[in-house]
Amino acid sequence: MQITALLTGRGNSTLKDKNILEVCGKPLLAYPAEAARKSSLIDEFFVSSDDEKILSIAQDCGFKKIKRPADLGRPDSKHVDVIKHALGVIKEEGADPDILVVLLANTVCVKTEWIDECLREILKTPTISAVVPVVSDLDHHPYRAKKKDEDGFLEPFFDFGDRDISSNREEIGDCLFLCHNFWVLNVKKSVYTDGGFSPWKFMGDKVKPYELDWSIDVHTKEDLIRSENWVKANL
């Protein structure tokens, strides 16, 4: 069973050079990179980016560089296309990953034990297509979502028909949001299938949640401050 880590991050972002901005004295991408490097279960390490600064810093962390084409570095580029491109390059080098740990460069919220526990889930149950971190957030349950009608008034985002929806959040059931820190993919049952649920079809149709208390990915300067606070409290 071959397990490979793939760190992903592009240079073209709204917060300039966010993936390499310092958080508590280290480049942002070093946090997921180092967490993966400390895993005893991962065999190989690659980084995919269109940005040479990202590639060089990740290489310093022990990751082999994959320079992605420009069309995979745009804001509207899809993660699945980045993953497939990287897997193609990895296979050209003679490797054929069974499990791929996709690491997102713009987060500090990754721990080695989290990665290993997700990996062990798939190793124990090979029918699982992916294991992904999630957080519970009942305050933002989709049943509570609204939109504006043509006259500018609020209306339910969904048409519930005659169904009565409770305003008590404890009565409306689970609401789990996918984290953007890392995803563990059982490659043959996920990336190359089309049976998953939108918008992450590449994760396959047997996705196990790995519940976290909190997670953040960086898009603003305020996110950097929150990330620093998390690092000081957790690492």
Per-segment meaning from a language model:
Residues D81, V108-W200, K208-E211:
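Conserved core of the sugar-phosphate nucleotidyltransferase
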Residues E52-V101, C109-E117:
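Short phosphate-binding loop-to-helix
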Residues L21-E22, V47, V102:
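Conserved SAM-binding loop
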Residues F45-S49, P133:
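Short internal beta-strands
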Residues L28-E44:
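A short, N-terminal amphipathic alpha-helix
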Residues G195-I216, K221-I225, N229-L235:
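Catalytic donor-sugar/metal-binding loop of nucleotide-sugar-dependent glycosyltransferases
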Residues M1-K16:
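N-terminal nucleotide-binding beta1-loop-alpha1 segment
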Residues I42, A95-P97, T127-I128:
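Short, high-confidence coil segments that cap the C-terminus of an alpha-helix
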